[in-house]
Amino acid sequence: MEKTFNLTRRDDGIAILTMDVPGETMNTLKAQFGPEISEILAEIKSDPHIRGLVLISGKKDSFVAGADISMLDACKTAGDAKALSQQGHVVFNELEALKIPVVAAIHGACLGGGLELALACHQRVCSDDGKTMLGVPEVQLGLLPGGGGTQRLPRLVGITTALDMMLTGKQIRPKQALKMGLVNDVVPQTILLQTAVEMALAGKRAPKPIKKSLVNQVLEGTSFGRNIIFDQATKQVEKKTQGNYPAPAKIIDCVRQGIAKGMQKGLEVEASHFAELVVSKESEALRSIFFATTEMKKETGAEGATPRKVKKAVILGGGLMGGGIASVTTTKAKIPVRVKDISEKGLSNALAYAYKLLDKGVKRRHMTPAVRDNLMALMTTTTEYKGVKDADIVVEAVFEDLALKHQMVKDIERECGEHTIFASNTSSLPISQIAEAATRPENVIGLHYFSPVEKMPLVEVIAHAKTSPETIATTVAFARKQGKTPIVVQDGAGFYVNRILALYMNEAAQLLLEGQSVEHLDKALVKFGFPVGPITLLDEVGIDVGAKISPILDKELGERFKAPAAFDKLLGDDRKGRKNGKGFYQYGASSKKTKAVDETVYGVLGIKPSTNKDAKALAERCVVQMLNEAVRCLDEGIIASPRDGDIGAIFGIGFPPFLGGPFHYIDTLGAANLVKILEGYQSQFGNRFEPCERLKTMARENVSFF
């Protein structure tokens, strides 16, 4: 078996320990490395000629990306997981206890267990490269740093900074890491090893005192002040997680106990809490999402098809969506973009939108003005079809008007090459209808982005019956280069995400008309785990947008999609939501901090607001509609698998990640239980709650999706 760790000795007495996991592009920590590391440490301790040790990666752009997450699935009990954490503690404690200076030379990803390894070293130096990022993202998998991170990080950078890193999972850039005391130096990659060797030769040095604000000095320097920090962090966590995620509270407890009772006690608490989280249903769900997205990155979207390289893109429409799509194409994919709009104003807006996003990076010192300007230079504009002939893909982001989209298809087929892909960003019109205007329908596909484009990770790649496999594969690859998570769905009204969202939103509107208050409804679904409530979402998306989509779904998919009368009443009062400052909530300068309901909306709807229904019951009524429709989409072949359905719902509409997605959640509930709930509502409210056939079959046969 090939070794992962290689120890070499220099003439100056410094030993270099290189980590290079055989056959993998990135280093990850595995349980089986324990004996190998212990053997090397014993060798180092027994050699009096070794004056210092430098730990470095043999990978091109990765220090250590973290622990191998698949190890956790092998843990059948909390005891197994605890033993895993304790094994890490033993190795890292042994490294830290070496009498010679130990320096971590970091280039590339230094995350999770990788950062915990670096923290066990006496000093750290990292490259100034953009690929170098440091962090402890375990909380995003429903876990905590289980290799001593909850103890060493607060002692190095301070309690407040450490809690911020661990509770958010944020990744830190090199200069920021130096400023906060996480690393001792930042240098160009070309002299990284040399600098680390010089640090080791200089011997162990006491860490520099952390620069803290006066307030932080007072708070962190006394037990009374520290209690204030921990109590405040707990309140913020409870507000943010609504009690749905156990990891943040356990992270706070690890730090609290470690600071109060000492490092050894802190490590014991860390191992116990880590073990409990590993076997929790929340972490299992979050890890399933991680594995699903990792698996999807290896797929082309069309079996056996090879994607063509996209060297140039054209965006039709300079509005909010067009500007956003153009922006991610230049900034993320680094692909030249030509934006075409009928008006100079639309083009100016698209350029301004892209510049504003890039300038944020400059202001936050994530990029230089020169880099911003070079990326902006990739974007050019036109009011006519000039400079579009060599486009490999054209993304259409114009109004939801079929005749207009037909004209766009004809224009592109006339002006561009025979292999140019026409990708429509329609949110509701079937792609087959758009392709009716094409002489090359195999090049027509849907590419449905979500707003705001630069923030929302999902795109739906929609294939109609005649879309070629090569077109699908090329579009999927293009979306990935934009930093998106694409799921391939088949053609049909509403596709997948908007289809399952529509019934959820309709049910919320129905509950509103039954007299439930706006705040009560929104709070109920936020408590369930959604990032925002359905009424807030309706205001953000636009009440007029919802009203346009509903008739299309109603016509194509049937009576259950018929929108409640609320939409017509609201639009009759010119309420479109945030976009025109008039919706369910108040908008304006005074409403920025505390969002208040516009009480006049109740008069428009003809209701008296009430909070008389249980929050769990409200959430259940909305969510079961979404679950039922998700299974219908799977049954009809709209989505290829339960995995894709889970990813689409989580990344497209914020379905609670700790539940793992609609299909994982159905497995948790049990199909028989869900059918029973749906039939109960069907008897009360009618056939819109009728369970789909597949759910009934699953209930009878007692089967699950995973």
Curated annotation (Swiss-Prot):
It comes from Shewanella putrefaciens (strain CN-32 / ATCC BAA-453). SUPFAM superfamilies: 6-phosphogluconate dehydrogenase C-terminal domain-like (SSF48179), ClpP/crotonase (SSF52096), NAD(P)-binding Rossmann-fold domains (SSF51735). GO terms for molecular function: 3-hydroxybutyryl-CoA epimerase activity; enoyl-CoA hydratase activity; long-chain-3-hydroxyacyl-CoA dehydrogenase activity; NAD+ binding. Keywords: Cytoplasm, Fatty acid metabolism, Isomerase, Lipid degradation, Lipid metabolism, Lyase, Multifunctional enzyme, NAD, Oxidoreductase. In the N-terminal section; belongs to the enoyl-CoA hydratase/isomerase family. HAMAP family: FadJ (MF_01617). Its EC number is 4.2.1.17, 5.1.2.3, 1.1.1.35. Pathway: Lipid metabolism; fatty acid beta-oxidation. This is Fatty acid oxidation complex subunit alpha. Catalyzes the formation of a hydroxyacyl-CoA by addition of water on enoyl-CoA. Also exhibits 3-hydroxyacyl-CoA epimerase and 3-hydroxyacyl-CoA dehydrogenase activities. InterPro entries: 3-OHacyl-CoA_DH_NAD-bd, 3HC_DH_C, 6-PGluconate_DH-like_C_sf, ClpP/crotonase-like_dom_sf, Enoyl-CoA_hydra/iso, FA_oxidation_alpha_subunit, FadJ, NAD(P)-bd_dom_sf. Heterotetramer of two alpha chains (FadJ) and two beta chains (FadI). It catalyses: a (3S)-3-hydroxyacyl-CoA = a (2E)-enoyl-CoA + H2O; a 4-saturated-(3S)-3-hydroxyacyl-CoA = a (3E)-enoyl-CoA + H2O; a (3S)-3-hydroxyacyl-CoA + NAD(+) = a 3-oxoacyl-CoA + NADH + H(+); (3S)-3-hydroxybutanoyl-CoA = (3R)-3-hydroxybutanoyl-CoA. The keyword Lipid biosynthesis does not apply. It holds the Pfam family 3HCDH_N. GO terms for cellular component: cytoplasm. It is found in: Cytoplasm. One of its GO terms (biological process) is fatty acid beta-oxidation. Residues 308-706 are annotated as: 3-hydroxyacyl-CoA dehydrogenase.
